[in-house]
Amino acid sequence: MKLKTLKTLTLASLLAVSLPAMSLMSASPSFAASALASLDPDHDGTVDLTEAKAAASALFDKLEKDHDGTLDHKELHGRISDKDWAVADPDNDKTVSKDEYLAYVEVLSKKADPDNDGTIDAKELSSPAGHALLRLLK
């Protein structure tokens, strides 16, 4: 019984330490740089709105399994938070059309581009806004 308790406590301790580290890793500059490489077809080291929308459109098509032209919460797999759902779904029909999805990508692109140069680099992708954008692109 003591061994089982010790194993449980050890596992809980490992999870307590590793889960926050994993969330930091996903937003780290190296993760963002890796993601950027797959989203940057012209290899200029940045993602512009056209590239972001192309990636988002491809992901939308991949996620849209029931062919009704929209994504619901289930199909989005948590890519849009409950807090942000109203922004992504302005007609409040509980689904996001491709046009709404791409409009939301544009909103997040602007948030992820604090210097307003029209492009998003790896550092900007590693920000919270950049991370939210990545969830809609990959």
Residue ranges and their predicted role:
Residues 26-50:
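Short N-terminal segments immediately surrounding and downstream of signal-peptide cleavage
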Residues 40-44, 64-68, 89-93, 113-117:
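Acidic carboxylate motifs that coordinate Ca2+ or other divalent cations, activating on Asp/Glu
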Residues 2-20:
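Bacterial N-terminal signal peptides that target proteins for export
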Residues 112, 117, 121-126:
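Short, exposed beta-strand-loop hairpins at the edges of beta-sheets
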Residues 51-58, 73-83, 99-107, 122-132:
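Amphipathic regulatory helices of Ca2+-sensor modules
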Residues 17-29:
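C-terminal segment of classical bacterial N-terminal signal peptides
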Residues 45-49, 69-73, 94-98, 118-122:
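Glycine-aliphatic tripeptides that mark coil-to-beta-strand junctions in extracellular
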Residues 136-138:
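Short, solvent-exposed mixed-charge patches
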